[in-house]
Design a protein with these regions (language model features):
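HTH-adjacent hinge/linker in prokaryotic transcriptional regulators
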Residues: 1-47
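A ubiquitous structural signal for well-ordered alpha-helices
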Residues: 33-36, 40, 52-55, 125
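Glycine-rich phosphate/diphosphate-binding loops that line cofactor/substrate pockets in enzymes
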Residues: 47-59
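Glycine-rich phosphate-binding loops that contact phosphosugars or nucleotide phosphates
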Residues: 57-177, 181-191
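A short, charged, Gly/Pro-tolerant segment at domain boundaries
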Residues: 192-210
Length: 210
C-alpha cells in the first residue's frame, strides 16, 4: 500500500498553477479549506460524536496519540481538554506513546489521530490501548483503514489530500475542527465542572501575562 500512494509531486498544490496571482491563490486556498470543513461536517456521524463525548466525560484518563503532523494535533487536543480539568496526556515520542498505551485501563480512553489511518505507530499504539482494556476513538480521513479496525468509535474527516501529503494544512484544519467540536460538546455537557476547570486553569497562568 505504501508504494501505491507514494507518487512524484508534479505541483506545489493540486488546485494552484504557477500563473496564479496572489489574490487568486488566496481565494483558491480559502475555498478549499472551507470546502474541507463543510464536507467534514457532512460526513460526521452525530451518533458517533455523542458516544465519543460520553466516553471522554466518563473516562479516568484520556490519551491522545499521533505522530508527525498528527502528533502536534494531539498536543493541541491535550491543551484544550486539560483546560477543562480532565486528566489528559499526549506525547510526540512513539515509544512513550506505546508505554502509555499499555498502562491504560478499562475506564480510560485512547484517541488515535491519523489522516491516512495507516500510520503504523499510531495504529499499533491504539491496538495496545485496546488490548489493555481502554476504549479507542480514532480520527481519520479513511473509513477503510487499519486504524478503524481497532477503534470503538470512528470520527471521519474529509480533507482532499493523498496520504503522502498528510502534513498539508487542509488535513490539519479538518482534524482541529473536529477536535474543537468534540471539545466544545464535552465542555457543554460537563456544565459547571467545565467552567470550574477553565477558571482554575486560567488563574494558573494569569501571572504569565504582563
Amino acid at each position: 500500500m505504501a508504494k501505491d500512494i507514494v507518487e512524484p509531486e508534479t505541483s506545489i498544490h493540486e488546485s494552484i498553477s504557477y500563473d496564479d496571482s496572489i489574490p487568486i491563490l488566496v481565494q483558491k486556498i480559502t475555498n478549499e479549506n472551507m470546502m474541507t470543513l463543510s464536507n467534514t461536517v457532512k460526513l460526521l456521524s452525530m451518533d458517533a460524536l455523542e458516544k465519543a463525548v460520553d466516553l471522554i466525560i466518563n473516562a479516568d484518563k484520556i490519551e491522545f496519540f499521533g505522530v508527525g503532523a498528527s502528533g502536534y494535533t494531539a498536543l493541541d487536543a491535550k491543551y484544550k481538554f486539560l483546560r477543562l480539568g480532565l486528566k489528559v496526556d499526549a506525547n510526540l515520542d512513539a515509544h512513550i506513546q506505546a508505554i502509555s498505551a499499555v498502562n491504560l485501563g478499562e475506564r480510560d480512553v485512547a484517541v488515535g489521530i491519523s489522516f491516512s489511518g495507516s500510520t503504523k505507530d499510531t495504529v499499533e499504539t491504539c491496538r495496545l490501548a485496546k488490548n489493555s482494556g481502554a476504549k479507542v476513538i480514532c480520527i481519520t480521513n479513511y473509513a477503510r483503514s487499519p486504524i478503524t479496525s481497532v477503534a470503538d468509535i470512528v470520527l471521519l474527516t474529509a480533507a482532499k489530500e493523498t496520504p503522502l501529503r498528510s502534513g498539508a494544512l487542509t488535513s490539519k484544519i479538518a482534524q482541529l475542527h473536529l477536535l474543537d467540536i468534540l471539545y466544545t460538546a464535552v465542555a457543554i455537557k460537563m456544565r459547571d465542572k467545565a467552567l470550574q476547570g477553565l477558571n482554575k486553569t486560567a488563574k494558573a497562568v494569569l501571572d504569565k501575562l504582563y
